[in-house]
């Protein structure tokens, strides 16, 4: 696991995501989710490569049931990009690294 990835919970979401000084890409995931496991190594690479511009956070929906409904999380993996405490963009489903970097480059 990359040290650059932040693990957030219902309790830490406001502090770690909404009050972050950097944009935060939050991966809503679960242990049983195959596509979530597929994108995990890509997110680790992104966390390292974009460390100067972006925080990458992982949010386990099974362990933290309160936050996902606030953002209408219906399927996983769901990636939400927050800037200055506001939800700026959403991507649902497993993305390739090229798709994810194109998405991030268009938003940052």
UniProtKB/Swiss-Prot annotation:
UniProt superkingdom: Bacteria
Alphabetized UniProt keyword annotations: Disulfide bond, Electron transport, Redox-active center, Transport
Gene3D superfamilies noted in UniProt: Glutaredoxin
Listed InterPro entries: Thioredoxin, Thioredoxin-like_sf, Thioredoxin_CS, Thioredoxin_domain
One Pfam family, short name: Thioredoxin
Keyword Disulfide bond set for record: yes
GO BP annotations listed: cell redox homeostasis
Keyword Zinc in record: no
GO CC annotations, alphabetized: cytosol
Similarity comment: Belongs to the thioredoxin family.
Stated name of the protein: Thioredoxin
Gene behind the chain: trxA
